[in-house]
């Protein structure tokens, strides 16, 4: 991504994985939203599976506890674990534009100037978590990360970390690098998540911060 960005000449950079299938107008909707809302640093579409079911691509920043829960559930998004459900924002209505901590890097739009200001993706991440990291740095620059479900894309996502294999270990290594890089002081940045209760029994009391839809 960083190599491609160096050769980009437009005002905005679209990060797009090769396994993304675009729907009509999806890119235009992201672009139109971005230019109308300069406080938004990163805007990401709704990602769905081939069967049109939702992919939980918008998430909150994890804690070590959530990371361990994800490892124990083998990254299963259908896990009933309350911490995992909170991490995946399953308790929030995700049918309107919403400020979120971070979105999967399979698809998102960012201004060229801001991308350069962030110095792009951290190349010390060999695989995984670099999308979480750039969103975290976006918030630290006082820019928002917005999940924009009016733009829809299909992500032919093949989860490769369902079993404890080499890729799973790389994923875990990237998570721990992210925590170590930020001195293990990770907290939610989106306004509706910042004041969210931390105790497990209260994890479903988050309130969404809905943002303008146009």
Model-identified regions with their sequence ranges:
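Glycine-rich, basic loop-to-helix element that forms the pyrophosphate-binding segment
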Residues: 1-8
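Acidic metal-phosphate-binding loop of nucleotide-sugar-dependent transferases
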Residues: 20-21, 125
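Short aromatic/hydrophobic "clamp" motif used to bind/position activated sugar donors
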Residues: 13
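Catalytic metal- and UDP-sugar-binding loop of GT-A-like glycosyltransferases, i.e.
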Residues: 16-18
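Short, flexible, basic/aromatic active-site loop/helix in glycosyltransferases
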Residues: 62-100
């Amino acid at each position: 991504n960083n190599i491609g960005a160096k050769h980009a000449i437009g005002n905005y950079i679209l990060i797009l994985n090769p396994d993304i299938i675009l729907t009509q107008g999806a890119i235009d909707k992201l672009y139109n939203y971005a230019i109308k809302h300069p406080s938004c640093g990163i805007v990401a579409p709704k990602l769905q599976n081939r069967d049109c079911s939702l992919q939980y691509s918008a998430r909150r920043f994890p804690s070590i506890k959530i990371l361990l829960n994800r490892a124990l559930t083998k990254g299963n998004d259908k896990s009933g674990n309350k911490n995992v459900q909170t991490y995946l924002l399953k308790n929030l209505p995700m049918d309107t534009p919403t400020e979120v901590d971070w979105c999967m890097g399979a698809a998102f739009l960012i201004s060229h100037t801001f991308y350069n200001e962030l110095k792009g993706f951290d190349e010390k991440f060999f695989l995984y978590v670099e999308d979480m990291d750039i969103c975290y740095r976006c918030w630290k620059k006082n820019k928002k990360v917005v999940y924009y479900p009016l733009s829809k894309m299909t992500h032919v996502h093949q989860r490769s970390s369902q079993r404890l294999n080499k890729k799973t270990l790389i994923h875990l290594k990237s998570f721990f690098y992210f925590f170590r890089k930020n001195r293990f002081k990770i907290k939610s940045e989106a306004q509706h998540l910042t004041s969210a209760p931390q105790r497990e029994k209260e994890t479903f009391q988050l309130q969404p911060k809905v943002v303008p839809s146009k």
